[in-house]
Amino acid sequence: MLKTTLLFFVTALCEIIGCFLPWLWIKRGASVWWLLPAAASLALFVWLLTLHPAASGRVYAAYGGVYVCTALLWLRVVDGVRLTVYDWCGALIALCGMLIIVVGWGRT
């Protein structure tokens, strides 16, 4: 379970970075060269999703829970926004959903 969660976390970071770098280019006028590491990050994101033994749709659904939590961590650390009680509650619900799906992988 820990290995799966850690893999989902790294996958989420790759997706967020792959989307954040083009955002910097478009919104903040960063160099167009940031699109190269963005593309590499998104390619790594896709590859990491293939490392799970479950069906792709199940992997995507479970990954979503960890993505929500990782995005909120990004919001706090990178964007400097303080999380609200609604953020924490949403993260908890998302993680519970991920846990239910992952535990069920071996039972189907």
UniProtKB/Swiss-Prot annotation:
Pfam families: UPF0060. GO terms for cellular component: plasma membrane. The keyword Ribonucleoprotein does not apply. The chain crosses the membrane at residues 6-26, 31-51, 61-81, 85-105. Keywords: Cell inner membrane, Cell membrane, Membrane, Transmembrane, Transmembrane helix. It is found in: Cell inner membrane. The keyword Transcription regulation does not apply. Its main location: membrane. Residues 1-5, 52-60, 106-108 are periplasmic. Residues 27-30, 82-84 are cytoplasmic. It is a multi-pass membrane protein. Belongs to the UPF0060 family. This is UPF0060 membrane protein YnfA. The lineage of its organism: Bacteria, Pseudomonadati, Pseudomonadota, Gammaproteobacteria, Enterobacterales.
